[in-house]
């Protein structure tokens, strides 16, 4: 005879709506091989860690897409797929009294900023946009090195002045021809040989 199990008297638990939590873990950045993180919910008075939570990304393909790992101490928004408490999903991050925006608000409300934070350092990389009419600006900062790879042609057009300053050495290699057209004056100062 087959064993009989009594019918379940209680429905499986469900979590309704999003919650916020604090990212926890070892060091400054803690994730597994799938980019999952650990969080602690505000109601968790014992300070227990959650299971690893998947992190929603703006793009996620096979070997391509975007990867932004929330760091320890950040406040994140957690949803539960189909309300299942065993399926947490981090859907975003929020600023709070502990973690402020990268520029003053509302004074900088016309700026869109993408700023990172150097791991175990004091610097940052940044791409920012100023959208105030008459002051529009695209700003890029590399805390250390900047590398650009172009697979075919590269074109740059400047509508007014252009300045470049190199604090150390500069080298240039041209595989074939070089053409330079100057509409007015050209001056060069060489201090050494």
Sequence positions of predicted segments:
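Short aromatic-glycine motifs in intrinsically disordered, low-complexity regions
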Residues: 5-15
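Surface-exposed acidic, glycine/proline-enriched linker/cap segments
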Residues: 4-7, 122-124
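Structural signature for extended repeat/solenoid scaffolds and their inter-repeat hinge/linker regions
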Residues: 18-193
